[in-house]
């Protein structure tokens, strides 16, 4: 059983997946910091010195000065400011992944086009019986029809 697990874990796909998860986690932290520490303060400043992480709707009916106070008191709140931060965070990650996947697909198509070599046709269809025949044939071996194209070319 250990041997099977070792073979499974050492397959390229599993290791690639593990590396992707680790890099994705680190990338997520960077994007979260970008949103929380750089983008949202600038947007907050532009719309009137608002800290989006403190925007909430108090459902308890009591008065609180901040989201932290409401949460400490156990009040029910709708934290739409944190939701906006997470939404922007998601959009940045989704757009980044879209760009990476688009570039990977572009690279795959580029290499695929390079590999596609123009192969010269060696067969054609008989106009009478529609079977595949050699391109140089002057008579169809299946229906024995004389092929006009080949006779015209040889004259």
Curated annotation (Swiss-Prot):
Signal listed as a keyword: no
Presence of keyword Transmembrane helix: yes
Signal peptide location: none
Sorted UniProt keywords: Cell membrane, Ion channel, Ion transport, Membrane, Transmembrane, Transmembrane helix, Transport
PROSITE patterns named in the record: MSCL
A GO term for molecular function: mechanosensitive monoatomic ion channel activity
Transmembrane segment boundaries: 14-34, 81-101
GO cellular component: plasma membrane
Highest taxon listed in the record's lineage: Bacteria
Localization terms from the record: Cell membrane
Family matches, as InterPro entries: Mechanosensitive_channel_CS, MS_channel, MSC/AndL, MscL_channel
Pfam families: MscL (PF01741)
Its job: Channel that opens in response to stretch forces in the membrane lipid bilayer. May participate in the regulation of osmotic pressure changes within the cell.
Self-association state and partner proteins as the record states: Homopentamer.
HAMAP family tied to this protein: MscL
Protein name (Swiss-Prot/TrEMBL): Large-conductance mechanosensitive channel
Upper lineage: Bacteria, Bacillati, Bacillota, Clostridia, Eubacteriales
Gene: mscL
């Amino acid at each position: 059983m250990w041997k099977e697990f070792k073979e499974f874990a050492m397959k390229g796909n599993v290791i690639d997946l593990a590396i992707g998860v680790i890099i994705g986690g680190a990338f997520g932290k960077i994007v979260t910091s970008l949103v929380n520490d750089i983008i949202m303060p600038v947007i907050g400043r532009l719309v009137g010195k608002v800290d989006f992480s403190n925007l909430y709707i108090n459902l308890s009916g009591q008065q609180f000065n901040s989201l932290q106070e409401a949460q400490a008191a156990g009040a029910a709140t709708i934290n739409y400011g944190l939701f906006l931060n997470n939404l922007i965070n998601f959009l940045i990650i989704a757009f980044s992944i879209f760009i990476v996947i688009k570039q990977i697909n572009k690279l795959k198509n580029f290499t695929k086009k390079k590999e596609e070599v123009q192969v010269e046709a060696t067969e054609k269809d008989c106009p009478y019986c529609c079977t595949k025949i050699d391109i140089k044939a002057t008579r169809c071996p299946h229906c024995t029809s004389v092929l006009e194209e080949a006779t015209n070319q040889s004259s």
